[in-house]
Amino acid sequence: MAQEAVLFREALGEVLRAERMRRGLTLRELSGRARISLGYISEVERGQKEASSELLASLCEALEIGLGTVLRVVSDNIVAAERAHAPITLPVGANSGDVVASAA
């Protein structure tokens, strides 16, 4: 069975929504601060729209969080999701048949 790919836009949307909620902001408040339509922000948060670099910069500024921080959290979340769904492989020694790595 093929592993479902983690989409960047979905991971980004989850991080942006979590940050907005952590700050206690409504979509309407964030929309006003970022000067981006409420509907578009909602679609970005749900992973339905790709955020341009300009839009992402506006959202980060409105959320008072650095772009690098957002991208690092998104990257960490993607890596964690990929690891959680990665098949477990146990390489064995070439001649001895001894296990040289474990799944732990």
Stretches found by the model and what they are:
Residues 1-22:
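A short, Lys/Arg-rich alpha-helix, primarily the initiator
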Residues 16, 27, 38, 53-56:
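Helix-turn-helix DNA-binding elements, focusing on the entry/boundary residues of the two helices
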Residues 20, 31, 60:
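The alpha-helix within a helix-turn-helix
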Residues 26-42:
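Short alpha-helical DNA-recognition segment
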Residues 55-60, 70:
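Hydrophobic micro-packing sites on short alpha-helices
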Residues 72-104:
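Short, charged recognition helix plus adjacent turn
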